[in-house]
Amino acid sequence: MQTPKLVILLALAMSAAMVNLSQAQNSPQDYVSPHNAARAAVGVGAVSWSTKLQAFAQNYANQRINDCKLQHSGGPYGENIFWGSAGADWKASDAVNSWVSEKKDYDYGSNTCAAGKVCGHYTQVVWRASTSIGCARVVCNNNRGVFITCNYEPRGNIVGQKPY
């Protein structure tokens, strides 16, 4: 009787460790650190975590859980959204790195993106006036993938202004 109990306890402990590992890769610091690395690279000050923005992001992510659509919330904050296909364990760093990868398509001198390219996610990440972020992640229902959103305050990407 002791052996089955031990096996069950070990299985439960391993499951808890795997859940904690997944949560650890999507903690506030897992969003803040890559944002701040990108910001430091262009001489912009750090952002800090906002539980208010996190709550807004989580509420919106929960609304996307059934369809996983890349659709903006239309809320009062700056916003970046990310979708990752089913079958992969998309993490905070995957989303932020995706947005930061647009740097190569941004020309600071002209404050424009390369022809046919997108760079607004990157400019929001490094927007000097944005000082707070809050993010959320959901695994969408029916094998639709992962939806990640980050919100920024004050919002960035003001037309006619450079990010830094």
From Swiss-Prot:
CDD domains: CAP_PR-1 (cd05381). It holds the Pfam family CAP. It comes from the Eukaryota. The keyword Isomerase does not apply. This is Pathogenesis-related protein PRB1-3. Disulfide bonds join C68-C140, C113-C119, C135-C150. InterPro entries: Allrgn_V5/Tpx1_CS, CAP_dom, CAP_sf, CRISP-related, V5_allergen-like. GO terms for cellular component: extracellular region. Belongs to the CRISP family. Probably involved in the defense reaction of plants against pathogens. Residues 34-152 form the SCP domain. One of its GO terms (biological process) is defense response. Keywords: Disulfide bond, Pathogenesis-related protein, Plant defense, Pyrrolidone carboxylic acid, Signal. Residues 1-24 form the signal peptide. The modification Pyrrolidone carboxylic acid is found at Q25.
